[in-house]
């Protein structure tokens, strides 16, 4: 839906500075029930003897482009836009890519764990979508069903050489 567009920017300015339409579209709409379902999935996976989650990121400012790019910043990835859930078919590619909807998590999981994670999501009644894959080409792209890539950048252009922080859970 056309919500949560520019929320990260609009949240940093005084109310009324932009037109009401821009501010209304920037407001993220929360859904406590879906938030709890997503939390239950993540918690269940993390509590398993072998956690299938390689990396996880929430959809905050800049939506899919921020979340999914950070999941694959070490190797690159290709996102199939036709696999992304879309509630409004009139959205532009930019609106789909940068939508800051709430209660969405991006998970990087091994291919062999997809069906297991899907079963956990189904048990918790949380929607799950497999939307892309890692590529190893150090590029991050969104590709439409017709093959057009409205977003295609080298990972280095997005992240530069910022220091990395690694946390290990024991």
Where are the regions a protein language model picked out?
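Intein/HINT protein-splicing elements and their conserved insertion hotspots or analogous self-processing inserts
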Residues: 1-41, 45, 49, 53, ...
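Conserved short-loop catalytic and cofactor-binding motifs
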Residues: 26, 56, 105
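Active-site-proximal betaalpha loop/short-helix elements
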Residues: 33-102
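Short hydrophobic/aromatic beta-strand micro-patches
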Residues: 106-110
């Amino acid at each position: 839906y056309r919500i949560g567009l520019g929320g990260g920017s609009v949240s940093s300015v005084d109310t009324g500075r932009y037109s009401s339409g821009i501010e209304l579209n920037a407001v993220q709409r929360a859904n406590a029930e879906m938030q709890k379902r997503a939390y239950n999935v993540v918690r269940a996976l993390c509590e398993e003897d072998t956690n299938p989650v390689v990396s996880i990121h929430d959809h905050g400012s800049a939506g899919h482009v921020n979340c999914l790019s950070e999941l694959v910043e070490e190797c690159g990835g290709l996102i199939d836009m036709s696999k992304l859930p879309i509630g409004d078919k009139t959205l532009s590619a930019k609106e789909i890519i940068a939508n800051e909807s709430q209660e969405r998590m991006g998970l990087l999981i091994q291919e062999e764990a997809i069906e297991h994670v899907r079963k956990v999501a189904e048990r918790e009644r949380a929607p799950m979508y497999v939307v892309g894959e890692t590529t190893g080409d150090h590029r991050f792209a969104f590709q439409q069903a017709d093959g057009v890539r409205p977003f295609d950048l080298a990972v280095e252009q997005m992240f530069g050489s910022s220091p990395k922080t690694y946390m290990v859970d024991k």
